[in-house]
Amino acid sequence: TDDPRRSLKMRVLGIDPGITRCGLGVVDVDATRRASMVFVGVARSSTELAQHFRLAKIADAIDRVIGLYHPEVVAIEQVLAQDNLRSVSTTMQVMGVALAAAGRAGLPMAIHTPSEVKSAVTGNGNADKAQVQHMVARILGLDKPPKPADAADSLAIAICHAWRGTGLLGARSDSTVAVSSSGKLSARGQLTAAQEMWAQAQAAQRRTGAVDPRRRRS
């Protein structure tokens, strides 16, 4: 018989922030941690445009994806300090655009560090891009990783959030909530019914020791 937990799914929009290319990936993940790709793409902006117009293009693309695919949560990768401070600055602006898009849609927003995403998808927080892309394709049952890398990265971010459930900034515009890696909830009453059911299913899955999808054979 089919596992009833497979009927309980969460749809996550993962965003890999970038001003020239912003990866956007939507995945459905059930309570047994099986993941499937719903959409993947890259929002682009021309270097010939002024900065605020470039950001507007990225914002419009995120709004369109949210409107078309109706994710239940948005997850984005944390921007960390790098040598190129200008690049960090523009990427943080895109991150702000994504936060605003989630806020306009009334969606919870989660932030995950690059090492957290790598660890969730590959089991190694120091994995390189090729390893991440390979595991994204394997987890989602794809023949090959999506291109460019920004697209695959957005899917990895979505998978990371669906599997870990941490990093949430808020379930609603008037509240904050966190879901620990063990599935324990804080501010339970402020979660939506679907989010509460998902967290409980994830916690039960961890207790019963469900097979890690990264180790499943196709």
Please provide the spans of the model-predicted regions.
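Phosphate- and other anionic-substrate recognition elements at nucleic-acid/protein interfaces
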Residues: 1-218
